[in-house]
């Protein structure tokens, strides 16, 4: 893991086309602005985990429904 210190107004680059800038530093929070191509998906980690869990639950439900339907002929 790379750890980088940045001050308000400073940026870092990921590759050639993603720029992350520190826009505000408050008590207990840092506000970032992200400039990236529209093709790049940017999600907060907690939201990503929530979506991932919902997808797992949905897939499990789909399988049980298919098994029930398969049993009916």
Swiss-Prot record:
Keyword Ligase set for record: no
Pfam families: CsrA
Gene3D superfamilies cross-referenced by the UniProt entry: Translational regulator CsrA (2.60.40.4380)
GO molecular function, a single term: mRNA 5'-UTR binding
Cellular component GO terms held in the UniProt record: cytosol
Subcellular location, principal: cytoplasm
InterPro entries, A to Z: CsrA, CsrA_sf
Record carries keyword Cytoplasm: yes
Gene Ontology annotations of biological process type: bacterial-type flagellum organization; mRNA catabolic process; negative regulation of translational initiation; regulation of bacterial-type flagellum assembly; regulation of carbohydrate metabolic process
Annotated localization: Cytoplasm
Keyword vocabulary terms for this entry: Bacterial flagellum biogenesis, Cytoplasm, Repressor, RNA-binding, Translation regulation
Job description of the protein: A translational regulator that binds mRNA to regulate translation initiation and/or mRNA stability. Usually binds in the 5'-UTR at or near the Shine-Dalgarno sequence preventing ribosome-binding, thus repressing translation. Its main target seems to be the major flagellin gene, while its function is anatagonized by FliW.
Complex and partners: Homodimer; the beta-strands of each monomer intercalate to form a hydrophobic core, while the alpha-helices form wings that extend away from the core.
Sequence similarity: Belongs to the CsrA/RsmA family.
UniProt name for this protein: Translational regulator CsrA
Species of the source: Clostridium kluyveri (strain ATCC 8527 / DSM 555 / NBRC 12016 / NCIMB 10680 / K1)
């Amino acid at each position: 893991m790379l750890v980088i210190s940045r001050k308000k107004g400073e940026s870092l680059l990921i590759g050639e086309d993603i720029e992350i800038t520190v826009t505000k530093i408050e008590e207990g929070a840092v506000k970032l602005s992200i400039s990236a191509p529209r093709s790049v998906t940017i999600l907060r980690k907690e939201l990503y985990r929530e979506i991932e869990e919902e997808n797992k639950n949905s897939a499990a439900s789909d399988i049980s429904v298919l098994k029930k339907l398969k049993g009916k002929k």
